[in-house]
Each structure stands twice: as structure tokens, then as C-alpha cells.
Swiss-Prot record:
EC number(s) reported in the record: 3.4.21.88
Keyword set, alphabetical order: Autocatalytic cleavage, DNA damage, DNA repair, DNA replication, DNA-binding, Hydrolase, Repressor, SOS response, Transcription, Transcription regulation
Cited SUPFAM superfamilies: LexA/Signal peptidase, Winged helix' DNA-binding domain
A matching Pfam family: LexA_DNA_bind
GO biological process, one term: DNA repair
Record's protein name: LexA repressor
Family: Belongs to the peptidase S24 family.
Function: Represses a number of genes involved in the response to DNA damage (SOS response), including recA and lexA. Binds to the 16 bp palindromic sequence 5'-CTGTATATATATACAG-3'. In the presence of single-stranded DNA, RecA interacts with LexA causing an autocatalytic cleavage which disrupts the DNA-binding part of LexA, leading to derepression of the SOS regulon and eventually DNA repair.
Amino acid sequence: MKALTTRQQEVFDLIRDHISQTGMPPTRAEIAQRLGFRSPNAAEEHLKALARKGAIEIVSGASRGIRLLTEEEQGLPLIGRVAAGEPLLAQQHIEGHYQVDPSMFKPNADFLLRVSGMSMKDIGILDGDLLAVHKTQDVRNGQVVVARIDEEVTVKRLKKQGNVVELLPENSEFSPIVVDLRQQSFTIEGLAVGVIRNGEWL
């Protein structure tokens, strides 16, 4: 799903909440009334915009013909630049969704992360690539992980011994990142399960 404007997000949230509360979507007239539009036609324009962005499907010929598209139907979310201190999968980090079958990766991918930098180039993870990530904290030494150190997110190979974690690059021009778990905040966000070369699937 492409990023929504503030007004489109209000319409989307109203539809979702209405379905949750009543079991059915609102009519155009109900949307217009709730959000202060002058006419149902204004609501219709916002619905068309939501459909173009992949957030909903409009079923023609029905006053309540609105269907929210699930994450599975939208595809895997693509995470771009992550703001400090915010959840990785926060809506504002999602650049879009790509129709990639999660089951083509083992274990299944939960999201795609846009790679920034060349610290993992020796194993074929390049700047701008899309890294397929399985969301888990169950990881082992030697695996390539997505980790958060304090507020920074990075992709590195994991080496943990006692209270010390080393995040190893796959590029001799970069140094390992050493984390003292007694002094720094450290979280595993997921396990790298595959890579899509930049532009290959887009």
C-alpha cells in the first residue's frame, strides 16, 4: 500500500473501525457525514484514491461495496529509512508493498528491508537491495540478522558470547560493531532469509 494522505488515512481508519464495530463497511453518505464532506461524491473520490493506492477494493453496484485489502493481498511491506526510537514496522516506515510470495523464502519472509550501504557486499547484499526478513528473535551465531543497537538499525552477521555481541560486516573496509549488553540497548528485529537485487522485481 502506498503512503496515504492525512485525509485518506482518516477515511481508511473510518472504514476499518466501522467494519470492526458493525461487521460491514459504511456507505458513501455515512463517510461524508462522519468526516464532514459536503456530499457522498467527495467520499467517493477519496475511496477511488484509496483503491488506486491498494488500500481497498471497490465492489461496483453496492452502496457498501468496500473491501479492505489484507496485508497478504497487498504483498510484503517494504521498510525504508527507520526513524530513531520507533518500531521497525511502523506505518510511516513502510514505503509500499511488493507482490512477493513469502513462502519462496525459508523460513517465510515477513517484510522487506531496503539495504543502505555496502558493509555486507561480500555475501551479495548490496546498497539498495531488498533484504527479505523473517521476524524473529530466535537466532544463532553465524546468521545474518537485522539488529537494533540503541536507536540504529543494521544488517550484520551475529556473534554473541556472554554479555558481548559482535556484529560482523562482510566487507574488509568495515569494522565489527561491538555491543556490551550491560550498557547498551540491543534488539534482534529479524533473520535475513533472502535478497532481491535492486530493481529485479520492481
